[in-house]
Amino acid sequence: MWPGLVGKGGEGAEASIDLDKMLDYTAKAEVNGVKFDGVDLFLYNPHVDIDITDDGIKKLAEKIQSRGFVVGTVVAPVWFDGSAMGDATQRANWVSAVRKACRIGQKLRDLGVRPYGVVRIDSAAPVTAWNKDPKGNTKLIAKTFREGGKVAKDHGERLAAEGEICWGGMQSWKYMIQTLEETGMPKVVGFQADMAHTLLYTLGYNAPTAHRIVPQNYHWEPEAFHKAMKKMTAALRPWTIDFHVAQNDATVKASGDHEKTGKHCLATDPNGKLNIARDAGYWMRDDASKVTKKFQHICWDGCMFPNDVMGKQETWNNILSAMIQVRENHGWRA
């Protein structure tokens, strides 16, 4: 539900879209009789207050169930007064946001509305600050991630770090792996792969030249693309516990108070570099092309679209159509 909030509501940005409207957009989508099963939630106002009461969580569950939905992954708002790489207070605030998100996630499970999903996190640290001491800052981020991981484990949750080029210690595929390995909690703290963001990993944005996988004179030749995707996903897939279906035109975008990160495109964008139905398989299948069955749901991520685009039913139907194709190609039954 975060596309209704991310990059919106700030000075000079479009108004945010409330949760009820986002749920209604989702509920109205239908392709050949198939509808969305549920939603992932951003635990941030005006959608969901991170300090929501138990009664409020019950009302939230009822609101979602009334539309025939379940909840999957929830996003912990770790950025505003927290950072996994900050001072003691900022790091404590980061862990506090994770604790509160885990509480909400656990309550939703107890209420029977959340059968699967994880808690999404990131380092909440700028790349420029991380660059001043890469080794020391990676160790500090990992230490904070471990503290968050212990909290998650106590709540029966797992944490998934979403790899984006805008977060320190997570801005390249190699740095992301280093951070996860340093954290050292593979059963609790893993990776959230977003098709749009990870595409930029292959191009080496915000990272040393050695982290770029494709050739310098790359022009999207199929063989080079395939080789790069195979190499990246082989390295990150063992850590991957949550997945975002998405499209990207290989550019970056910022909106409102959100830093430049991988640009999400509409599912049908002619400039999109991904074949969504095919390329999801790099993440959902292993090196032998066998379905991994690593996660029980997949989620569409498409942030910073104009509100008029968000208000078109065609937008949601096209997203659902892409999701159905991914499930048909790489899905599994429990």
Spans of features found by a protein language model:
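Active-site groove signature of glycoside hydrolases
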Residues: 105-134, 155-166, 299-300
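Conserved beta-strand positions in the central sheet of alpha/beta enzyme cores
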Residues: 35-40, 73, 114, 118-120, ...
